[in-house]
Amino acid sequence: VSAVVGTHTHIPTSDYRVLENGTAYITDVGMSGDYNSVIGMEKQAAISRFKYPKNKHPRLTVADGPPTLCGVIINSRKNGLAESIKPIRIGGVIDNVGI
């Protein structure tokens, strides 16, 4: 397996590494989008849905604040096993500080 890249919490983790048998791993690569939002959507509408679930709500709209791009770059050998993994975090409120 070349890589196992998790995402769900939308909070990037710092546990990236190449495992013993050549699999690149990170628990959560993070979210791409506006971090001053509710998983990329306008905050007030998302909070209203949570607070008043029985009310009818319009579709959520994408937040338009400064975006952050999160991801990883994985270099692999010809045999498909990972050689390295490096997180990327560009723009927005989290960046490659300390990476």
Predicted segments with their positions:
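Conserved beta-sheet core of the metallophosphoesterase superfamily
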Residues: 1-62
